[in-house]
Amino acid sequence: MPLKLQKHLPAIELLKQEHIFVMDSLRASTQDIRPLHVVVLNLMPLKITTETDLVRLLSNSPLQVELDFMKIKGHESKNTPVEHMREFYKDFDLISRDYYDGMIVTGAPVEQIAFEDVTYWDELRGIFDWSRTHVTSTLYICWAAQAGLYHFYGIPKYDLPEKKFGVFKHTVLDPHRPIFRGFDDEFYVPHSRHTEIRREDIVKVPELTLLSESERAGVYMVMSRGGREFFITGHSEYSPNTLRDEYFRDIHKGLPINLPENYFMFDDPLKPPLVRWRGHANLLFTNWLNYYVYQETPFNIEDIKNLGDIC
């Protein structure tokens, strides 16, 4: 089942070129189905790129999903047209009374700043707290995972001596969890970050469950509240060329950057990337939507406020 998207969202035409079926809200309204309502708090600089990456994965589910995009109030995007933000994004004030089956909070390029020094930290904390009474299950990605773990559980982040950059092998620690249905014992995920969270801090907190980690990239997936929250440090949603674009961007800016590990064929940046995370990325988002959103959310969406932890 395709996603229900606002008409003229750029991702629609981009994904049609990849033969991915999406429909606009007018056509979707003719189907007598209660769609899943998912909101994306998009903190990434390249909004349209991130929208497309997420829509690509969410559209692979047999479930109909209606997607909203949220932005931080008063925060102007420097890399996305103002007209796009006005047409497709809502401030938190406009949706704070709404309920959602799922929420995705993206990363943000602020990881080397103390959480309390991020200009929108207070609003973000409010959104995090709101999600616990208004959302069935939330995915926190990359910096958002660090921010969520810090806000709810006091988990610190640590600076890395150099950027963690590349595609790394990960292991499944609890293969019986529904989030891992269909996963191989080892799988690959892109990472692009300057900071990390550490295993020893996670395991000290009884409310947290470490689900997956990497020998090279460290903690990857942490779960809380039985699956009502997932904290994911990598970027399984990345398109094939995202790390390449980041690499050449930093090269052109004269910034120190290593070749992304396990990414370019023969480690040659003039050759195309070797994509080996696409299958597990699709499984991750499909499993989340099916087992932790669709199967747990109430039919009357306002009953989300009465949900407890997922057993």
Feature roles, as predicted:
Residues 1-74, 89, 95, 99, ...:
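Amide-donor transfer/coupling interface in amidating biosynthetic enzymes
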Residues 73-86:
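N-terminal beta-loop-helix "entrance" segment that forms/cooperates
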Residues 102:
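Short, Asp-centered acidic motifs that coordinate Mg2+ and/or phosphate
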Residues 105-174:
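Cysteine-nucleophile active-site neighborhood
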